[in-house]
Amino acid sequence: MRIFFCLHRFAALILSIYIMDENENKPDTNARRAAWLEYVAWICAAAAMSPVFYWLGAAVVDSQQLRDSFIILVVAGIVIAMSHEIRPHRPHFSADSLTALCAAYAAFFGAQILGDRLGIIPTLLLTFFGVSAFIVSAGLACFDRKRYVYAFGGAFFIFTLLSIAVRIFDLPLRMLAGKLSALVLSLFNDTVGLYMMKGSDPQIAMNVGGASYLVATECNGFGIISSCIVLSAILTFFGGSRSILKKGAIVIGSGLIGYILNSLRIVSIIAVAPLAGEKGYFYWHEAFGYFYFAVAMLVVIRLSRRNP
Protein backbone atom coordinates (compact mmCIF):
# COMPACT_ATOMS: atom_id res chain seq x y z
CA MET A 1 0.00 0.00 0.00
CA ARG A 2 2.79 2.47 0.81
CA ILE A 3 4.31 1.83 -2.61
CA PHE A 4 0.97 2.64 -4.24
CA PHE A 5 0.65 5.91 -2.32
CA CYS A 6 4.22 6.92 -3.16
CA LEU A 7 3.65 6.23 -6.83
CA HIS A 8 0.40 8.16 -6.65
CA ARG A 9 2.04 11.24 -5.16
CA PHE A 10 4.97 11.04 -7.54
CA ALA A 11 2.68 10.75 -10.56
CA ALA A 12 0.53 13.63 -9.33
CA LEU A 13 3.65 15.78 -9.02
CA ILE A 14 4.71 14.81 -12.54
CA LEU A 15 1.31 15.69 -13.97
CA SER A 16 1.28 19.07 -12.23
CA ILE A 17 4.74 19.87 -13.59
CA TYR A 18 3.59 18.86 -17.06
CA ILE A 19 0.54 21.13 -16.91
CA MET A 20 2.64 24.04 -15.68
CA ASP A 21 5.07 23.53 -18.55
CA GLU A 22 2.23 23.51 -21.05
CA ASN A 23 0.79 26.73 -19.69
CA GLU A 24 4.12 28.53 -19.62
CA ASN A 25 4.57 27.85 -23.36
CA LYS A 26 8.36 28.02 -23.23
CA PRO A 27 10.79 26.94 -25.96
CA ASP A 28 11.87 23.50 -27.08
CA THR A 29 13.69 22.64 -23.84
CA ASN A 30 10.45 22.59 -21.88
CA ALA A 31 8.74 20.69 -24.70
CA ARG A 32 11.37 17.96 -24.58
CA ARG A 33 11.15 17.80 -20.81
CA ALA A 34 7.37 17.50 -21.00
CA ALA A 35 7.75 14.68 -23.52
CA TRP A 36 9.68 12.42 -21.17
CA LEU A 37 7.43 13.41 -18.27
CA GLU A 38 4.53 11.94 -20.22
CA TYR A 39 6.29 8.59 -20.42
CA VAL A 40 7.17 8.68 -16.72
CA ALA A 41 3.53 9.34 -15.84
CA TRP A 42 2.42 6.28 -17.80
CA ILE A 43 5.23 4.15 -16.35
CA CYS A 44 4.20 5.12 -12.81
CA ALA A 45 0.58 4.22 -13.54
CA ALA A 46 1.61 0.91 -15.09
CA ALA A 47 3.82 0.10 -12.10
CA ALA A 48 1.03 0.89 -9.64
CA MET A 49 -1.46 -1.27 -11.53
CA SER A 50 0.96 -4.09 -12.33
CA PRO A 51 -0.47 -6.41 -9.62
CA VAL A 52 -3.87 -6.22 -11.31
CA PHE A 53 -2.36 -6.92 -14.73
CA TYR A 54 -0.49 -9.87 -13.24
CA TRP A 55 -3.69 -11.23 -11.68
CA LEU A 56 -5.55 -10.90 -14.98
CA GLY A 57 -2.71 -12.64 -16.79
CA ALA A 58 -2.72 -15.49 -14.29
CA ALA A 59 -6.51 -15.83 -14.66
CA VAL A 60 -6.16 -16.07 -18.45
CA VAL A 61 -3.43 -18.70 -18.14
CA ASP A 62 -5.45 -20.77 -15.66
CA SER A 63 -8.72 -20.74 -17.60
CA GLN A 64 -9.03 -22.00 -21.17
CA GLN A 65 -12.48 -20.42 -21.38
CA LEU A 66 -11.22 -17.01 -20.30
CA ARG A 67 -8.30 -17.39 -22.68
CA ASP A 68 -10.73 -17.89 -25.57
CA SER A 69 -12.53 -14.63 -24.85
CA PHE A 70 -9.24 -12.74 -24.44
CA ILE A 71 -8.00 -14.02 -27.81
CA ILE A 72 -11.31 -12.99 -29.41
CA LEU A 73 -10.96 -9.50 -27.90
CA VAL A 74 -7.40 -9.03 -29.18
CA VAL A 75 -8.10 -10.46 -32.63
CA ALA A 76 -11.26 -8.37 -33.00
CA GLY A 77 -9.31 -5.24 -32.09
CA ILE A 78 -6.63 -6.04 -34.67
CA VAL A 79 -9.15 -6.85 -37.41
CA ILE A 80 -11.11 -3.64 -36.81
CA ALA A 81 -7.90 -1.61 -36.93
CA MET A 82 -6.78 -3.26 -40.16
CA SER A 83 -10.16 -3.02 -41.90
CA HIS A 84 -10.56 0.68 -41.02
CA GLU A 85 -6.89 1.55 -41.63
CA ILE A 86 -6.34 2.62 -38.04
CA ARG A 87 -2.62 2.97 -37.43
CA PRO A 88 -0.75 3.80 -34.21
CA HIS A 89 1.55 6.79 -34.03
CA ARG A 90 4.21 7.97 -31.63
CA PRO A 91 2.61 8.41 -28.18
CA HIS A 92 1.84 11.95 -27.09
CA PHE A 93 -0.38 13.48 -24.45
CA SER A 94 -3.67 15.16 -25.31
CA ALA A 95 -6.45 16.59 -23.19
CA ASP A 96 -8.48 13.38 -23.61
CA SER A 97 -5.51 11.18 -22.77
CA LEU A 98 -4.73 13.22 -19.67
CA THR A 99 -8.37 13.09 -18.55
CA ALA A 100 -8.45 9.30 -18.94
CA LEU A 101 -5.18 8.95 -17.02
CA CYS A 102 -6.49 11.12 -14.17
CA ALA A 103 -9.67 9.01 -14.11
CA ALA A 104 -7.51 5.88 -13.93
CA TYR A 105 -5.56 7.22 -10.96
CA ALA A 106 -8.72 8.43 -9.20
CA ALA A 107 -10.59 5.13 -9.64
CA PHE A 108 -7.66 2.86 -8.84
CA PHE A 109 -6.43 4.64 -5.73
CA GLY A 110 -9.98 5.43 -4.65
CA ALA A 111 -10.57 1.68 -4.59
CA GLN A 112 -7.43 1.17 -2.47
CA ILE A 113 -8.34 3.90 0.01
CA LEU A 114 -12.09 3.24 0.31
CA GLY A 115 -11.98 -0.53 -0.18
CA ASP A 116 -12.94 -1.39 3.42
CA ARG A 117 -15.96 0.91 3.30
CA LEU A 118 -17.18 0.06 -0.17
CA GLY A 119 -17.08 -3.73 0.01
CA ILE A 120 -15.45 -6.19 -2.34
CA ILE A 121 -17.71 -5.80 -5.41
CA PRO A 122 -17.56 -1.97 -5.67
CA THR A 123 -13.83 -2.12 -4.95
CA LEU A 124 -13.26 -4.58 -7.78
CA LEU A 125 -15.41 -2.49 -10.13
CA LEU A 126 -13.43 0.66 -9.32
CA THR A 127 -10.12 -1.17 -9.66
CA PHE A 128 -10.99 -2.67 -13.04
CA PHE A 129 -12.41 0.65 -14.22
CA GLY A 130 -9.12 2.30 -13.28
CA VAL A 131 -7.11 -0.29 -15.21
CA SER A 132 -9.40 0.06 -18.23
CA ALA A 133 -9.14 3.86 -18.07
CA PHE A 134 -5.35 3.53 -18.09
CA ILE A 135 -5.55 1.45 -21.27
CA VAL A 136 -7.88 4.05 -22.79
CA SER A 137 -5.40 6.78 -21.87
CA ALA A 138 -2.58 4.93 -23.61
CA GLY A 139 -4.83 4.25 -26.59
CA LEU A 140 -5.83 7.89 -26.95
CA ALA A 141 -2.15 8.80 -26.93
CA CYS A 142 -1.33 6.28 -29.67
CA PHE A 143 -4.41 6.40 -31.92
CA ASP A 144 -6.40 9.25 -33.46
CA ARG A 145 -9.65 7.29 -33.70
CA LYS A 146 -11.31 7.89 -30.33
CA ARG A 147 -14.26 5.61 -31.06
CA TYR A 148 -11.90 2.69 -31.63
CA VAL A 149 -10.08 3.32 -28.35
CA TYR A 150 -13.29 3.68 -26.34
CA ALA A 151 -14.73 0.53 -27.93
CA PHE A 152 -11.67 -1.53 -27.03
CA GLY A 153 -11.49 -0.02 -23.54
CA GLY A 154 -15.16 -0.77 -22.88
CA ALA A 155 -14.81 -4.33 -24.13
CA PHE A 156 -11.69 -4.79 -21.98
CA PHE A 157 -13.61 -3.57 -18.91
CA ILE A 158 -16.30 -6.17 -19.61
CA PHE A 159 -13.57 -8.79 -19.97
CA THR A 160 -12.18 -7.89 -16.53
CA LEU A 161 -15.64 -8.40 -15.04
CA LEU A 162 -15.87 -11.79 -16.74
CA SER A 163 -12.52 -12.74 -15.20
CA ILE A 164 -14.06 -12.72 -11.72
CA ALA A 165 -17.26 -14.42 -12.91
CA VAL A 166 -15.60 -17.48 -14.43
CA ARG A 167 -15.66 -19.45 -11.17
CA ILE A 168 -18.66 -17.81 -9.52
CA PHE A 169 -21.04 -18.86 -12.31
CA ASP A 170 -19.54 -22.27 -13.06
CA LEU A 171 -22.17 -24.37 -11.28
CA PRO A 172 -25.18 -22.16 -12.18
CA LEU A 173 -24.18 -22.22 -15.85
CA ARG A 174 -23.78 -26.00 -15.79
CA MET A 175 -27.24 -26.33 -14.27
CA LEU A 176 -28.79 -24.01 -16.88
CA ALA A 177 -27.00 -25.79 -19.74
CA GLY A 178 -28.09 -29.16 -18.39
CA LYS A 179 -31.73 -28.06 -18.03
CA LEU A 180 -32.00 -26.68 -21.57
CA SER A 181 -30.20 -29.72 -23.01
CA ALA A 182 -32.48 -32.08 -21.09
CA LEU A 183 -35.53 -30.16 -22.32
CA VAL A 184 -34.45 -30.51 -25.96
CA LEU A 185 -33.50 -34.17 -25.56
CA SER A 186 -36.83 -34.96 -23.88
CA LEU A 187 -38.54 -34.10 -27.17
CA PHE A 188 -36.90 -37.16 -28.73
CA ASN A 189 -36.36 -39.45 -25.75
CA ASP A 190 -38.77 -40.25 -22.92
CA THR A 191 -36.07 -41.30 -20.46
CA VAL A 192 -34.16 -38.09 -19.75
CA GLY A 193 -33.16 -37.16 -16.23
CA LEU A 194 -30.98 -34.43 -14.74
CA TYR A 195 -29.28 -35.03 -11.41
CA MET A 196 -27.07 -33.09 -9.05
CA MET A 197 -24.46 -34.99 -7.06
CA LYS A 198 -23.75 -32.97 -3.94
CA GLY A 199 -20.41 -32.81 -2.20
CA SER A 200 -17.36 -30.60 -1.84
CA ASP A 201 -17.32 -30.36 -5.64
CA PRO A 202 -20.95 -30.64 -6.84
CA GLN A 203 -21.47 -32.33 -10.20
CA ILE A 204 -24.31 -32.22 -12.71
CA ALA A 205 -25.17 -35.51 -14.41
CA MET A 206 -27.65 -36.33 -17.16
CA ASN A 207 -29.18 -39.73 -17.84
CA VAL A 208 -30.41 -40.26 -21.39
CA GLY A 209 -31.74 -43.63 -22.53
CA GLY A 210 -29.98 -45.40 -19.69
CA ALA A 211 -26.58 -43.82 -20.38
CA SER A 212 -25.09 -41.25 -18.00
CA TYR A 213 -23.23 -38.11 -19.04
CA LEU A 214 -21.40 -35.63 -16.83
CA VAL A 215 -21.98 -31.92 -17.45
CA ALA A 216 -18.43 -30.93 -16.53
CA THR A 217 -16.91 -27.47 -16.08
CA GLU A 218 -15.87 -27.45 -19.74
CA CYS A 219 -19.56 -27.80 -20.64
CA ASN A 220 -20.79 -24.79 -18.66
CA GLY A 221 -20.50 -22.65 -21.79
CA PHE A 222 -18.59 -19.83 -20.15
CA GLY A 223 -16.02 -19.77 -22.94
CA ILE A 224 -18.53 -19.37 -25.75
CA ILE A 225 -20.76 -17.02 -23.71
CA SER A 226 -17.91 -14.72 -22.65
CA SER A 227 -16.47 -14.71 -26.18
CA CYS A 228 -19.87 -13.72 -27.60
CA ILE A 229 -20.21 -10.93 -25.04
CA VAL A 230 -16.72 -9.52 -25.61
CA LEU A 231 -16.96 -9.71 -29.40
CA SER A 232 -20.39 -8.10 -29.40
CA ALA A 233 -19.19 -5.36 -27.04
CA ILE A 234 -16.26 -4.20 -29.16
CA LEU A 235 -18.29 -4.38 -32.40
CA THR A 236 -21.36 -2.55 -31.07
CA PHE A 237 -19.33 0.09 -29.22
CA PHE A 238 -17.32 0.78 -32.36
CA GLY A 239 -20.27 0.48 -34.71
CA GLY A 240 -22.03 3.60 -34.37
CA SER A 241 -25.39 5.20 -34.13
CA ARG A 242 -27.30 2.85 -31.81
CA SER A 243 -28.44 4.07 -28.42
CA ILE A 244 -26.78 2.83 -25.24
CA LEU A 245 -29.84 0.72 -24.43
CA LYS A 246 -29.76 -0.98 -27.83
CA LYS A 247 -26.05 -1.66 -27.53
CA GLY A 248 -26.55 -3.14 -24.08
CA ALA A 249 -29.41 -5.30 -25.34
CA ILE A 250 -27.26 -6.61 -28.19
CA VAL A 251 -24.42 -7.50 -25.81
CA ILE A 252 -26.81 -9.32 -23.45
CA GLY A 253 -28.52 -11.01 -26.39
CA SER A 254 -25.15 -12.21 -27.65
CA GLY A 255 -24.50 -13.86 -24.31
CA LEU A 256 -27.89 -15.58 -24.59
CA ILE A 257 -26.96 -16.80 -28.08
CA GLY A 258 -23.80 -18.32 -26.63
CA TYR A 259 -25.82 -20.08 -23.92
CA ILE A 260 -28.30 -21.55 -26.42
CA LEU A 261 -25.62 -22.76 -28.82
CA ASN A 262 -23.64 -24.31 -25.97
CA SER A 263 -26.74 -26.25 -24.93
CA LEU A 264 -27.22 -27.40 -28.52
CA ARG A 265 -23.59 -28.54 -28.47
CA ILE A 266 -24.33 -30.75 -25.47
CA VAL A 267 -27.43 -32.12 -27.21
CA SER A 268 -25.41 -32.91 -30.34
CA ILE A 269 -22.68 -34.69 -28.37
CA ILE A 270 -25.18 -36.85 -26.48
CA ALA A 271 -27.10 -37.64 -29.67
CA VAL A 272 -23.94 -38.82 -31.46
CA ALA A 273 -22.36 -40.60 -28.46
CA PRO A 274 -24.14 -43.99 -28.94
CA LEU A 275 -23.02 -44.09 -32.59
CA ALA A 276 -19.50 -42.78 -32.02
CA GLY A 277 -18.62 -45.23 -29.29
CA GLU A 278 -16.00 -44.70 -26.65
CA LYS A 279 -13.16 -44.11 -29.13
CA GLY A 280 -14.96 -41.52 -31.25
CA TYR A 281 -16.62 -39.69 -28.36
CA PHE A 282 -13.73 -37.31 -27.71
CA TYR A 283 -13.42 -36.44 -31.40
CA TRP A 284 -17.09 -35.48 -31.69
CA HIS A 285 -16.95 -33.69 -28.34
CA GLU A 286 -14.22 -31.38 -29.66
CA ALA A 287 -15.63 -31.15 -33.21
CA PHE A 288 -19.03 -29.98 -32.03
CA GLY A 289 -17.33 -27.56 -29.64
CA TYR A 290 -15.42 -25.85 -32.45
CA PHE A 291 -18.42 -25.95 -34.79
CA TYR A 292 -20.85 -24.24 -32.42
CA PHE A 293 -18.19 -21.77 -31.31
CA ALA A 294 -17.67 -20.72 -34.94
CA VAL A 295 -21.42 -20.48 -35.50
CA ALA A 296 -21.76 -18.30 -32.41
CA MET A 297 -19.04 -15.93 -33.59
CA LEU A 298 -20.64 -15.59 -37.04
CA VAL A 299 -24.09 -14.93 -35.57
CA VAL A 300 -22.74 -12.34 -33.14
CA ILE A 301 -20.80 -10.57 -35.89
CA ARG A 302 -23.93 -10.45 -38.03
CA LEU A 303 -26.07 -9.21 -35.14
CA SER A 304 -23.58 -6.61 -33.88
CA ARG A 305 -22.73 -5.13 -37.28
CA ARG A 306 -26.29 -5.01 -38.55
CA ASN A 307 -27.47 -1.49 -39.35
CA PRO A 308 -30.01 -0.21 -36.81
Locate predicted features.
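N-terminal amphipathic/basic-hydrophobic helices that include classical n-h-c signal peptides
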Residues: 1-19
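Hydrophobic N-terminal alpha-helices or hydrophobic patches in metabolic proteins across all domains
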Residues: 21-308
